[in-house]
Amino acid sequence: MKFLHNQYTITMLILFFALTMLAVERVHAKEQKTSAIPVFNIFELGVQAGKAAAYDTVGENNITRSITNEPGTLSMVSVKDKENPNLAYMIEIYADDAAYRTHLASPQYKAFTEQAPSILTDHKLRLSLTAQYLGDKGSPIKQNGEMITNMVRINVLPGEEAAFKAAVMPEMVQSLAVEDGVLAIYAGTLVGAPNTWLFFEIYASESAYQAHRQTPHFQKYLSQTQQMLGEKTFYNLRPALLKNKGGLHFNSME
């Protein structure tokens, strides 16, 4: 009986150890999933005169195939300057560095880079951003002619960084959660210049955007931050191609 008791004790200890290790592995896996920092880039590109259609074609191929075939490519958006159709912007979000490297090695990206010299001018500006808040609705965007895109660049005054972040982050979270017309909000700070924020937003319509501006949470944000801000730059953009996976949620404060 003593032998059986000892054997039972050993078996229970082994089982306890196995369950403990499994729990640790699950926690570790969860931490790996939530701790990954997305790659967030905005590109400003000059398009040669008469090459707008060629740019749209190669860009559509790159965007569509990447969103469809690459699990880590979360959002790719092409927009144009309303007043200068030869000035284009690409907004790209990847799950992590590995996902971005996968995209750079893809055939559709290589096709884009091979055709770029005959389509683009020498004006190529990459804005590398530290993701602060990245969110979109649970389903992929189904683009239509009513949708609008906004991009704003804001310089936060020195010493106001923490207060500004504390004000703007909950406003973005609430906007996406409670407003049907807010389809995506992507916000980040410029790498090397953390006082510079860029916001890219997609709305279901102009009326949805105007309704957003009247919400209590947006008005609260305006009143809280009006003394914190320096220069603001508003980009006058129109959507060209909007593609995303849907269900993106990254909050640097969580």
Tell where the protein language model's regions lie, with residue ranges.
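Solvent-exposed, non-transmembrane alpha-helical starts
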Residues: 52-56, 101-104, 161-167, 212
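Active-site-flanking beta-strand signature of metal-NTP-handling nucleotidyl enzymes
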Residues: 38-46, 91, 148-154
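An amphipathic, aromatic/His-enriched active-site/gating alpha helix that lines ligand/cofactor pockets
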Residues: 61-77, 93-127, 176-183, 202-238
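A structural feature that tracks compact, well-ordered secondary-structure segments
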Residues: 44-45, 58, 62-66, 76-79, ...
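Bacterial N-terminal signal peptides that target proteins for export
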Residues: 1-13
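Structural beta->alpha junctions
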Residues: 46-50, 94-95, 154-159, 203-204
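Glycine-rich beta-strand-turn "strand-cap" elements at beta-sheet edges
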Residues: 29-37, 77-86, 111-149, 157, ...
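Bacterial N-terminal signal peptides
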Residues: 11-21
